[in-house]
């Protein structure tokens, strides 16, 4: 029974690592081009500081 448990844990770990490689990279830093496009899509009066975007831009 313990062997089955270890196999399940190993299989889950392998699947987790393989799907992480195929992720869209959402945990990576945005490129300068992405930041510029994001700034262009903001309504007037929005601040570029991520700390105040939610407050002033609703997003």
Curated annotation (Swiss-Prot):
Tissue specificity statement from the Swiss-Prot or TrEMBL entry: Expressed by the venom duct.
First and last residue of the signal peptide: 1-16
Residues with Glycine amide modification: 58
Propeptide: 17-42
Gene Ontology cellular-component annotations: extracellular region; host cell postsynaptic membrane
Chain segments carrying region Disordered: 18-43
Domain notes per entry: The cysteine framework is I (CC-C-C). Alpha4/4 pattern.
GO molecular function ontology, one term from the record: acetylcholine receptor inhibitor activity
Family classification: Belongs to the conotoxin A superfamily.
Subcellular location: Secreted
Disulfide bridge map: 46-52, 47-57
Origin superkingdom: Eukaryota
Keywords: Amidation, Disulfide bond, Neurotoxin, Postsynaptic neurotoxin, Secreted, Signal, Toxin
Bias kind Acidic residues: ranges: 19-31
Protein name, as recorded: Conotoxin Bu1.2
Pfam families: Toxin_8
Primary localization: secreted
InterPro entries assigned to the protein according to its UniProt record, in alphabetical order: Conotoxin_a-typ
